[in-house]
């Protein structure tokens, strides 16, 4: 079958951790001549970024119920019936050659209907702990791919309602412009260390509050040069916080060119979302990882442990991190140590993840 006649249905929704890796694969397959359409909701991030990328959307009426009230849970059967019908209609109309599910509750009805109609189904799990949708769909999938090793087999992982799944560790698709700095470049730098602080697109209040106070405890000669992404809601407050601490810092509400930000920094302080961890590894950036304490199934701790256990990062839980402890850690950092950590990060990276997932989709279409 010619690539120009192949069609991919993507199912990923809700957050950037699901949407952006799926978008990377979708764009790669479009470059190879595939037609792509996307199953999503109007409430998720996909409603904004997927049409902007020129990909057709098929809307489904699906919402999560975890942490919701009783009424929402009682309405789940009716909501699923509607979403199943919408997904079934999309598959019958568009007749995709391969269906790619990359998490989020939106993927569940589409994945179930793809299996019912005997469409090749690929499931990719971005986190170190399998999400509910992917745990269910993994039992039906033709190929199960993971961003971290041993997902669905960890003792701490959630059970799956079938025999043990055979999963393949392919890594997390990241943007192609995120690559490691040339070997030895960071160790050869002189002057103050360069610190990048990132709390995600919305910022991280705990990091915004803690980092300025920690840097204020250091002698001025030991302070790194700081670029701090605050999140749009926190930019003014964070600038005031650095000013009150008498610490010079470049505060940005959002960093458009993360590839350049990674290349320019010596180390980072950030959360441990799946995309962040994958990007740090590909960019070879040592990091202090502070997992978001309220992440579903505490998956950010597992994500962070992947780098920390290999000596590529420090892992500190938010409840254990104080300004004093952070200042002590920063004071003990030197370029040789950072260079060694950077090498470890690069060894763990899977920079070809996007192409690998695309290759697997193509193989199933033959």
UniProtKB/Swiss-Prot annotation:
The keyword Heme does not apply. Keywords: Cell cycle, Cell division, Cell inner membrane, Cell membrane, Cell shape, Cell wall biogenesis/degradation, Glycosyltransferase, Membrane, Peptidoglycan synthesis, Transferase. It is a peripheral membrane protein. It comes from the Bacteria. Belongs to the glycosyltransferase 28 family. MurG subfamily. Cell wall formation. Catalyzes the transfer of a GlcNAc subunit on undecaprenyl-pyrophosphoryl-MurNAc-pentapeptide (lipid intermediate I) to form undecaprenyl-pyrophosphoryl-MurNAc-(pentapeptide)GlcNAc (lipid intermediate II). This is UDP-N-acetylglucosamine--N-acetylmuramyl-(pentapeptide) pyrophosphoryl-undecaprenol N-acetylglucosamine transferase.
């Amino acid at each position: 079958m010619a690539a120009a006649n192949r069609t991919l249905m993507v199912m990923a929704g809700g957050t950037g951790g699901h949407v952006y890796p799926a978008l990377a694969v979708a764009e790669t397959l479009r470059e190879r001549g595939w037609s792509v359409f996307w199953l999503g909701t109007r409430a998720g991030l996909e409603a904004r970024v997927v049409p902007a990328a020129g990909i057709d959307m098929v809307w489904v009426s699906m919402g999560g119920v975890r942490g919701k009230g009783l009424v929402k849970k009682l309405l789940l059967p009716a909501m699923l019936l509607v979403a199943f019908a919408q997904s079934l209609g999309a598959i019958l109309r568009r007749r995709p050659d391969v269906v790619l599910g990359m998490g989020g509750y939106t993927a569940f009805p589409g994945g179930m209907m793809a299996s019912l109609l005997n469409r090749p189904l690929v499931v990719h799990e971005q986190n170190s702990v399998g999400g509910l949708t992917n745990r269910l769909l993994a039992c039906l999938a033709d190929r199960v791919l993971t961003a971290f090793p041993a997902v669905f087999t960890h003792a701490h992982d959630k059970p799956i309602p079938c025999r043990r799944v055979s999963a393949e560790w392919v890594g997390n698709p990241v943007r192609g412009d995120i690559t490691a700095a040339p070997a030895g470049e960071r160790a050869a730098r002189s002057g103050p260390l360069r610190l990048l602080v990132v709390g995600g697109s919305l910022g991280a209040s705990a990091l915004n509050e803690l980092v300025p106070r920690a840097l204020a405890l250091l002698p001025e000669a030991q302070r790194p040069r700081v670029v701090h992404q605050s999140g749009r809601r926190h930019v003014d407050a964070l600038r005031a916080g650095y000013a009150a601490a008498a610490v010079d810092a470049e505060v940005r509400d959002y960093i458009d060119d993360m590839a350049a930000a990674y290349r320019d920094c010596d180390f980072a302080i950030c959360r441990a979302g799946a995309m962040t961890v994958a990007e740090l590894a590909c960019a070879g950036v040592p990091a202090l990882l502070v997992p978001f304490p309220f992440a579903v199934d505490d998956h950010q701790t597992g994500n962070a442990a992947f780098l920390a256990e290999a000596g590529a990062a420090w892992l500190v839980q938010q409840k254990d991190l104080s300004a004093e402890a952070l200042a002590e850690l920063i004071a003990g950092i030197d370029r040789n140590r950072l260079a060694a950590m950077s090498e470890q990060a690069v060894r763990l990276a899977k920079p070809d993840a996007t192409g690998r997932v695309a290759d697997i989709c193509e193989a199933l279409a033959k």
